[in-house]
Amino acid sequence: MGLDLLSTYAPGIFDSLLTWKGVAGLVVAITLGYLIISRLPGQKSRPKLLDLKTGGISFEKVAAVYDDYDKSYGEGDHGELHVKDKNKVFQLANTFYDFVTDGYEWAWGSSFHFSQRMPGLSHAASQMLHESRMASFLRLKPGMKCLDVGCGVGNPGRTVASCSGAEVTGITINEYQIKRAEYHNKRTGLVGYFKPVVGNFCAMPFKDKTFDAAFAMDSTCHAPKLEDVYSEVFRVLKPGGLFATYEWVSTKDYDPNNSRHVKVMNSIIFGNGLPNIRSWKQAEDAGKNVGFKLVTSFDLATAPPVGKPWYYVPELMVKYGLLTIQKALVRGACNVGLLPNEGWKVCNMVADMVPNLVEGGATNIFTPMHLLIFEKPK
């Protein structure tokens, strides 16, 4: 994030800016921050504020599509949020990523996942370390064929291909993300090593027993049921193949009868386009139910203890008001017609979720990185 990058490349600047008073100080602070951030490594590949798009949604349809998104959710017996029509889950996910893909790259980067902040490493380097673990978990070697389930714009797939030599194919339901993935492939010289394909990961366009291994990073949470996507992964894996996934789940500390817990989880669901939230035990059982053998199951958020928590950067964003600045910039651009008139609602939807995301992590009722490793029996 901007603050995280400032803390890495320009220590002390942001803290000193925070002591300034008045509108002039705020303008100078934002300008300096923008100038510093825009010159940092990797920033030229990110969309700029006024370049933000809404995927396959035209500007004039943003308001109507957002209203449909909002109305897609209902509450269960305990007040927990869920998508009312399970047949529209993938349409919802596709709409969500049309809305947020450019915004994610602008505000977060091209790795659409969380990771612990490791000692001595920047935010981006910590993310790549988190991604590269997959190659080790799956025992990948040059020439092996690996599937990235729910690849987004492809950074995890490119990292895994780069550090393992394996041929990685990614699948995402969102066509705009395919365009962004292909752009990043050319930029990084990985055309031919990482191949993005558009498709539904619960009905994949691949033949049986195609891949030697598969992984998913913070993506299968969008499936209507985990069994739906796990069964497809099982089908396309060769016998003996491994499937590793970082799952967004509730932990053993989550209490569905605790109204505060439910409110926090509902915010995470709505602000991330999820159908609901599963528990870690439900995720384990889903893999077993489709025929996998469970090899490993533990919450990576609890280890190693030397790293800063996965919610460290979002916590800084909340603490220093960066979310408020982002919301103001987007609202201003919308008001003068540079972005869709109602586009600020999408920005607010995600930004207003972040404090609850931090609370979910800090209270240990939610984790985005429960590691499951499954094996398809030989």
From Swiss-Prot:
Keywords of this entry: Endoplasmic reticulum, Lipid biosynthesis, Lipid metabolism, Membrane, Methyltransferase, Microsome, S-adenosyl-L-methionine, Transferase, Transmembrane, Transmembrane helix
Origin superkingdom: Eukaryota
UniProt keyword annotation of Lipid metabolism present: yes
Signal peptide range in chain numbering: none
GO MF term list: S-adenosylmethionine-dependent methyltransferase activity
Broad enzyme group: transferase
Membrane topology term: Single-pass membrane protein
Reaction(s) catalysed (UniProt annotation): squalene + 2 S-adenosyl-L-methionine = 3,22-dimethyl-1,2,23,24-tetradehydro-2,3,22,23-tetrahydrosqualene + 2 S-adenosyl-L-homocysteine + 2 H(+)
Keyword Transmembrane helix: yes
Compartments reported by the entry: Microsome membrane
Residue spans crossing the bilayer: 17-37
Known EC number: 2.1.1.262
GO terms for biological process, alphabetical: methylation; steroid biosynthetic process
GO cellular component entries: endoplasmic reticulum; membrane
Function: Converts squalene to mono- and dimethyl derivatives, but not to tri- and tetramethylated products. Unable to methylate cycloartenol, zymosterol or lanosterol. Produces mainly dimethylated squalene.
Family the UniProt entry places it in: Belongs to the class I-like SAM-binding methyltransferase superfamily. Erg6/SMT family.
PANTHER family in UniProt: 24-METHYLENESTEROL C-METHYLTRANSFERASE 2, PTHR44742
Protein name: Squalene methyltransferase 1
Protein source organism: Botryococcus braunii (Green alga)
Gene behind the chain: TMT-1
